[in-house]
Amino acid sequence: MPPPPEPRQIKRPRLSLSCIVCRRRKVRCGREHPECANCVRMKENCVYKTMVHDEFTGRVRQVSPPPVPQGDNPNGPEFCANNSEERTGGFTWSHWMSQGSGNVLDLSDEAPLPRPTISPASAPPPQKRSTQAKCDASSVPHPHHSSTILTPAPSSHPQVDLVYPTVPSWEEAIQLPDNHHASSRAGTSRTSSVSQDASPAVSESARAPSTSTSYSGLPSPDYLSVRRGARVRYIGQAFWGLVAGKETLSDDFFDCNRDASMEQSLTHISSLGMFNLLRSLPTKPVSDALLDAFFFAVWPLSPLVHGPTLRADYDNFWEWCRNSDRALPPEKVRDDPTFLCLLFAILYCGASAAPPTSWACTNLQSLRKETTIKHLKSAYTTSLSLCQHLEHPTLNTLVSTLLTAPFLDRDVAPMRNMVSVSTTVRIAQSMGLHREGTWSSSLSPVDREIRRRAWWYIIGLDVQSSISTGLPPCYATEALDIVSMIADTRDEDIGDLSNHRSPEPVPRPSEQSLAVILAIARSETARLQSKIVSRLQNGRRLAQTELTELVTSAKKLQQKLDTLIARVPSQGIPEKGFIPSRLAKASPLYQTPAFSPYVWFCYRHYGPLQCVFLILVYLHTFPESGDIVLARYCIDEIIDHTVSHYQVPQDSFGATRADNSESDEGATEDQIPLAIQVLVDLHNRLQSHPRSDNQTTDRLDGNEYQFSPYSLELGIQGTEEDTIDKSIFSLPSLSSSSSRTHIHRNQEAPSTTTAPQMPSGTKHGPPSSVFVADSDGGSDLDILASLSDFETWSSSLVVDPSDILAHPTSMAPHHPV
């Protein structure tokens, strides 16, 4: 007898999470809020029904907002609190807290948020407001109402442990002893002195958990998911979870995208830790001075932030700090708290690169430089840890790591630097910086430009790391032709750029930026260098056609660089030998105090040392070259400067390095690195190499410049009896004419005895063919051209030894950057 059939199991009704339009059309809904991708594409009004599951009846019912009783006072505290929550979308600072962490703040106390400019001891006492004042419709809703505390729904994410690392407050930091290391340490949450802002207005970008572009009828080649909190995630076609036409479904495969709707908090950020970190900010005058130092000493070499936008956000942030007890934080800070990481990074870079003249100003003269740098470094690293940069990167945190890397990782070994660079490349790729699809049009012009600058900056780091270690680059060569080059315009004009930029005429002098010109030159050079390195690393023999292509590319690059150099404003007619008198008396840049703000850049990159090695090999291979005098002089200057950095105490502008010794963890500064020792040995071998009698005109000064791996002997300066054959000491002209430039320097300065002999009454100095001058005040941007020359020189040596020398240039002071 067959068994009786089992009774049909009654399934519990499921909650419908799709929007009404998709349910009516019977299509899969992406369930994005506030509008799904289907409704956006079809231009439909996307509406969701709020459904709940009744635990007692097992039924699913729609939730409707409760009516307001007529007898209730519309101005009462309950109505006012609920109304303020509705106006602000129900999003409060407590949304950044994890419900299961046990550290939900009690916002019933109306103590104001900490002001970075006021000492905790002098903070005003808490004040109570009347019910009528709280419910005044014309006033900003105060965030501190116990009835408006909203806690996030349980999440599948591991909750953030609010036992966060802390740093001292600014008042405590400036009183720390010199031997105190302001390192991150474990601490407990201090809720008594910090209160959270509630009910901030949510921006449109924050309301949308995912911003994507769907294309009717055609699958998108790639996909960029933009989430609240400025988090972006690039998803390529090779990803296993990407289905053509269903791109939004792949969002849920990434932890950074799950539960990222308006109702959920940013569980990966410790809001309490970030608020406590505000106590570590310097005062407003000190921050202003450090910001100016950043734009003066760091931004010209690394223009990775949009100046006008940064200054506007900076002013809005400090305006809120002055009124934090009655105003909401700026919208950008609410939507993207990683702005604090960028702020601390900029202040730390400004303090590290600030010249001695900046520390002598009124706002900084009372501070200890070493203590200030240590404190800001600790605050920056703590902010990066609180935001979990590696797991949830944003453009702010990525730019912060690029800006601070030269100061945090000084004198690191090439292999350690390689690991750091490879991690940075992968983070940039996960954010889609290596691609520019049709989805890039949804980004703002400023974001698109900063993404390009950051990507080409990373390309330069990767190619330098590849050359230093002999390993292949971390990216594919195809990415070099996908991302557009940096826009050749000032930051003030970036907002006016079109989405599809076409070739434009050369900007007028008033519309160009010297910092951007340098960035373009470095990016173009890095593009060619990476192609050469990638080709040499593929293991195949270089064919003649490939060599011809590389040589052609190098010549095109040289033309681009010449065009950029010609746009640098100049005074006089330097190509014909007419230069300002102050430039005729100029001393080497590294011996000039005006050079001190940019010393950090030279020791971060191996580019100049690689050029020295290439030139040394060239001199050994072609001892009878007509360029030997200029090449020998360049080598002597670089080795002199590099070796003296490690052995000669620097009590002026070199103090920047001494003050940053805390970042040289594990480095022995009194010992020359092995790579530099090898170059010094090669230099000594070159000097001791015997020469034939027919090379007497090429011989450098007889007083040999003696180097040893652990000692440095300064040479003897030239005398008035020094002479030189002008037929040897000549430079290629910027034009096709046969004119030559002869430089005369009368200012006494330490120099190497291996420098070329000069006519009577002059001293040694580097030749140059382009000089720029505005005034006699000195230049703080001269180093930019020299670094560009080194890269150009390196490219010329690698590809075409017969045309070794590019045009050395100098950039001038006081031009707008």
UniProtKB/Swiss-Prot annotation:
It comes from the Eukaryota. It is found in: Nucleus. InterPro entries: Sec_Metabolite_Reg (IPR050613), Transcription_factor_dom_fun (IPR007219), Zn2-C6_fun-type_DNA-bd_sf (IPR036864), Zn2Cys6_DnaBD (IPR001138). Disruption phenotype: Leads to significant down-regulation of the yanuthone D gene clister and losses the ability to produce yanuthones D and E. Pfam families: Fungal_trans, Zn_clus. Keywords: DNA-binding, Metal-binding, Nucleus, Transcription, Transcription regulation, Zinc. GO terms for molecular function: DNA binding; DNA-binding transcription factor activity, RNA polymerase II-specific; zinc ion binding. Residues 184-195 have a biased composition (Low complexity). Residues 113-127 have a biased composition (Pro residues). Residues 146-158, 208-217, 748-760 have a biased composition (Polar residues). Yanuthone D is an antibiotic against Candida albicans, methicillin-resistant Staphylococcus aureus (MRSA), and vancomycin-resistant Enterococcus. GO terms for biological process: DNA-templated transcription; positive regulation of metabolic process. Residues 102-161, 180-218, 733-775 are annotated as: Disordered. GO terms for cellular component: nucleus. Residues 19-46 bind DNA. PANTHER family: UNCHARACTERIZED TRANSCRIPTIONAL REGULATORY PROTEIN (PTHR31001), ZN(II)2CYS6 TRANSCRIPTION FACTOR (EUROFUNG) (PTHR31001:SF40). Transcription factor that regulates the expression of the gene cluster that mediates the biosynthesis of yanuthone D, a fungal isoprenoid epoxycyclohexenone that acts as an antibiotic against fungi and bacteria. This is Transcription factor yanR. It comes from Aspergillus niger (strain ATCC 1015 / CBS 113.46 / FGSC A1144 / LSHB Ac4 / NCTC 3858a / NRRL 328 / USDA 3528.7). The gene is yanR.
